[in-house]
Structure formats: C-alpha cells, structure tokens
C-alpha cells in the first residue's frame, strides 16, 4: 500500500474524488498484476502474458463507449477475439484494474483513520474469530436459530448502485456499467441466473468488492434495526409505561387510559436480544425468545431484500428450528445442541429432595458426507468413499506426492480441531492414506500390496502423527500445562483459510 500511495502522490486526480483518469494509468495494471501473483491460493491467479498492452486497454475502453448496445449478435458471443484481441485477457485486465481503483477510497480512509489520534470503535462489528467464543459461551443459552442464505442480486447493476454512496466519481460508475453490459453481451448465450456465477469466477476481485459492498449496506441497515430494538428494550418498562399513562391523561383528560392496554400495544418493543453471525454469504439469526419473534425478524429481512435491494426471496425457504431438536451447518461444521441430564440430591435439615439439572452444550460434528463429496470432487475417492489414485499427481516425485497428501490431511485435522468427535476424521485420514499409496503404486506400476511390502509402512508414518503430538514436540512444557488445565476443544485462528467447505458456494 505504501508503494501504491507513492504513485498516487504523483496523480492528484484522486484527491478530487476523480478515479476515472486512473483507469488509463499503466501502474494500476502493474499493481493489479502483482496482487494477482501474491494472492492467496484460494483464488486463481489471473493469466496475464507478455502480449498485454495498455494501448489495447485504452482502445477497448473507447470502443465500449462507441459501440451500439442495442445490436447484439449471438454469433459474436462465441468468438474469442474482440476487435482483433483476446477479449478474456483484456476484460480481466480491466476488471482487475477497476477493482484496484474502486478500493482506493476505502484504503485511504482506513490509512487516515489509523494515523488519527482517535480510532472509531465499532461495537457491533466483530472479527470472524469472535464466532468461536460465541459458539462456546452464548450459543448454549439460545433456543431458536434460523440459517439465512443471503440472496444474490438479480443483476450486477444493483451492486453498482450501492457504490454510489461510496464512490462519488460518476465517470467511473458509468465505465463500470459499460464494462458489465459489454461482458454480458460477450456471453449472451449464458443463462441469466448463471451470469453472476460465471462473472464471479472470471473476475473474482471485482466481484468480491461489489458483493462485499452489497453485504455491507445490507448489514448496516440490519444492525440499525437491531440496535433500535435493543435500545428500546433497555428502556425501563415500568417508567416507560408510566410516562405513556401520564401523557395519555394530559391528551385525553376525560377518557380513562388503562395501563393494561399499554403493554399490549407496545409488546413488540420488549423483544429479547437478537444474535446475528455471518460468514461469506451465509448468516445465522439466533434468539432466546419465541418463534413468533423469529418470524418477525424473518419478514424484516424479506421486506428489506425485496424493497431496498429488489431481490426476491421466499420466506418459506427460511426455516426457524429449535436448537435442541435440529442441527445447522455453518463454517463447515454440523452444529447442534446437546442436553446432558443429571439428578442432584439436596438435603435441608430433615428433608431431602431430588432436582433435575439440564446442562446445555454445543456439539460440533464433522460433516462426513460433505467431506467425502469434496474428496470425490478432487478425485481422491469415489462417491461411496472408496479411495482411488490421484492420476494427475503420478508424474511428481515420491516426496512431493507424500507431502501433498500429508499436507491435506493435517490441514483437515487442523481445521476440525474444534470438533466434538474425531471418529469421522480418522475415516478421512484412511481415505487419504490409501489414496496416496495407490498413487505411488500407480506411478511405479505396481500393486498396493507389493509396493507396501517393498518399501514398508514407515513410508507413510507422517499420516499417523497427530497435530497434538507435533505441538507437544515443539512446545513440550507449554502444551502439557495447557492440556492439564483445559480439556475442551481447541479453535485455531487460521482455520477459515484452509477448508474449502467453508467457502460458501
């Protein structure tokens, strides 16, 4: 960011909220290319080549404004060449460059806030790491939960409209509209409901920025409603009703105002606190109150999506479940409420009596069927969970093959360290271990039994090394003291970067 700010010091247009001239600066695309190379492995790198040229990008932008958008040819959509150039390459270049440009106001605002003397505190917004203590401490006190899938907008134009509150440069927004419109014309044979899905895969950085802006506005409105409800709830109910009774007598001195009517008319102000948790496109609403209260918030969300974001959502698809009877999927875990019943005998003087004590505890399980489906998609096993050889890795060295399998296995154990039961993970380890052996046997053109007899089982000894054993070898004193003082599950702070099941599809 410091290097990028050095370029911006030479270009004064951004200080006047003019981002449009930056689209014609070559360092923007160089910076976007460097970001693509240094990006996390969760996103694929953009395939720039040596033939890319800023001059062609300028010509392509000029042609966007000149061509007739009312004439669309279905035959032209199948052509890989646009004006004699590779349309996929330069559409990705413009997308990556524009994503960098629209992020400038947010980045500079963040840098300026960090340099200031007073840092604005957002008490309602938390890091993703706060989800784990929430599951451990507060979730067991709740009764009802509703897992909500945040709907995608029907058209990307809705995402562009959200940027109007953040980006004040109208020329940049017009260019973004032209680009999205042209991208749709280049792919006119795409089914409309799959358009956003394809755009998100080919232009991940720009789509993530647009979608995050959309979710940010949605959550700001939702948190405003939630805060208003909580502030009204915190008002003293006795004094609140007394003031209403007093003002009622002043306004209608002849008529009698019944205090019993006030709680009925203002019942909706006494709602208990609503908990909201989100990761990517999936969120959870949880409360200790009745299902009627949850239904009210469900229709709040539906009306918010339909009236403000013009997104159709069916209320019937948002299910409200009781935690003690249903489980829900979130962050790659299958979570449910486990109730442990115990009987306590109490004696006072000569009288003794029995008390039933119910202890609630959150139970986080490994979704074995989803994990097997993920391994089947990556060709480590079949649909039934039977291990198969990874044919695409057979050309690698033995060390690389074993290292890849061991890395996947340890990452899964690392991710599901917060699971209540590890039995399903040992099945996943068995699948990966046998798939590794079959891959090595295929490379050496041998059978599994012959290969193991020749090299021995010590070759795959790393598969049997638990992560807890690795930690005990690295930090022997600290880890032994930790295990003596704490017997519960362990949540690692980097787990959301590992498991592909967490990424909401």
Curated annotation (Swiss-Prot):
Subcellular localization: Plastid, Chloroplast
Any one Gene Ontology molecular-function term assigned to this protein's record: RNA binding
GO cellular component terms attached to this protein's record: chloroplast
Main localisation: plastid
Keyword annotations from UniProtKB, A to Z: Chloroplast, mRNA processing, Plastid, RNA-binding, tRNA processing
Gene Ontology biological process: mRNA processing; RNA splicing; tRNA processing
Family from the record: Belongs to the intron maturase 2 family. MatK subfamily.
Chain's role: Usually encoded in the trnK tRNA gene intron. Probably assists in splicing its own and other chloroplast group II introns.
PANTHER family attached to this UniProt entry: MATURASE K
HAMAP family: MatK
Protein name from the UniProt record: Maturase K
Annotated source species: Morus indica (Mulberry)
Higher taxonomy: Eukaryota, Viridiplantae, Streptophyta, Embryophyta, Tracheophyta
